[in-house]
């Protein structure tokens, strides 16, 4: 007998190729760096929850989902998973041309301009915990095996201001780790609640993946899904 699955987040769309969900803040997208398969599978992550969902309680089922992109643990909003490795690879190979992502963020301070953009090369620290902007890389001088800085572009538009903060709509032209958080922090306007990058403590990280627009890998149709923003980001 198959057990019923009550997911801790809503499914926004599902078909034979994809699952689109509204991930809550505080939930890992995928496992952290824990050694061993059993340890990875025991972690409470969106990936593991959806693996259990597609297997419908059948322990021997080989069905699973594939990671296409990530959201930080503290970030809520729209996420997409593939139901096959082939579909996942299609998106990974041409992510910038097949998708458009829009975020909402509340940042410290008052942004004077109505809109703007940040562009820099981002580099992860050796342990992968933090990210920072660095000079454009010179491949000829890079030590063998060293991490390579990757170009990142963040476009934003001011929506409103309140209590010494600014609500912004953000569009990513690239999808680098912690990209929005790093760019606004380095501009002197860290995301509210982002203690990792210099923001003041708050009830949550005020960053939300508002919408995801993508070209369906099978039909070629453009589709868009939205996750309602939480309190403080409306």
Identify the meaning behind each predicted range.
Residues 1-234:
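RNA pseudouridine synthases
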């Amino acid at each position: 007998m198959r057990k019923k699955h009550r997911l801790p987040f809503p499914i926004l769309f599902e078909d034979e190729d994809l699952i689109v969900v509204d991930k809550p803040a505080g939930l890992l997208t995928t496992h952290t760096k824990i050694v061993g398969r059993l340890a990875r599978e025991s972690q409470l992550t969106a990936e593991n929850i959806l693996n259990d969902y597609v297997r419908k309680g059948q322990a021997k089922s080989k069905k699973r989902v594939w990671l296409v992109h990530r959201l930080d643990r503290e970030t809520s909003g729209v996420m997409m998973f593939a139901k096959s490795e082939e579909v996942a690879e299609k998106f990974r190979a041409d992510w910038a041309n097949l998708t458009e992502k829009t975020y909402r963020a509340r940042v410290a301070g008052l942004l004077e301009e109505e809109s703007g953009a940040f562009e820099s090369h981002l580099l992860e620290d050796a342990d992968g915990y933090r990210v920072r902007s660095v000079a454009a890389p010179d491949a000829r001088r890079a030590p063998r095996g060293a991490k390579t800085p990757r170009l990142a572009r963040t476009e934003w538009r001011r929506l409103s201001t309140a209590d010494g903060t600014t609500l912004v709509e953000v569009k990513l032209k690239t999808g680098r780790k912690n990209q929005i958080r790093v760019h606004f922090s380095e501009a002197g306007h860290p995301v509210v609640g982002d203690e990792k990058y210099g923001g003041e403590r708050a009830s949550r990280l005020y960053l939300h993946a508002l919408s995801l627009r993508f070209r369906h890998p099978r039909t070629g149709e453009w589709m868009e899904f939205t996750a309602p923003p939480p309190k403080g980001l409306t």
